[in-house]
Amino acid sequence: MQKSTANPVTKTRPGPTATTNKTGNFGMLPPGATLPTEAQCAARVQLSSWEPRSDNYTANHRIPTAQQIAGMEAWNDSTGYDPRADALRKQIAGNYMGTTDEILQWTACKWGIDPNIVRAEAVTESYWHQSQLGDLTTDQSVCPPGTWNGTNCYQSYGILQIKYIYNKGEWPMSRDDTAFSAEYMYGVIRACYEGWTSYLVGRPPSPGYPSYHAGDIWGCVGRWFSGSWYDQGAIDYIKTVKAHYANEDWLKAGF
């Protein structure tokens, strides 16, 4: 395990607090904005001893190796991105350790996203469990290495459900490292929000919805689920995330 340069564990955490429903001193940054550094975001995280997902502890304190990060695939024309997006991809290292909520806050800060959107989407995808498995298949050709059990495997892993077939260079960090998993997924969202997910250009949305453009965070949230722009799958997914966002379900009793 590498030592994190932005590890909040050494800081004194206050007890559980309702401030986890607030955006703190960071939130949505428009396309083209200068994004905060990892260190700046570590300093902005609202620390708390609150940890509703103690099962995440090992993954929350694991950081990818330099070799693993070097194996990530570039974001360019061949992968459906404007080449400018690769500058975002190169910032992804999963270099943070903390509680599950602290990791989600840090991720939101780093990519200039409302933290409650990140929290709500993590509820939708995994109920905040980094161990979440999804998309069971009997097609061995789409299984991550080492996951085929002779009958089937799961394709999607982690707190925000990264699907192996579309993100091969991010395996096994997408399964094993919470900060990497969250940071990578929202790096994808940020590239979309900047207008740099080039394969979406020209894809027709459902009637009444706008075409792909920079600055539409909810369209980009839907794109994560369906791979398209305001198709019916994306629209339904957005509604689910928005409901968790409005209800702040991570603060409900029993979460």
Q: Which residues does each PLM region occupy?
A:
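Short, functionally critical alpha-helical segments immediately adjacent to catalytic or ligand/cofactor-binding
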Residues: 102-105, 110-145, 162-163, 185, ...
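Asp/Glu-centered strand-loop micro-motifs enriched in Gly/Pro and often flanked by an aromatic residue
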Residues: 87-96, 104-108
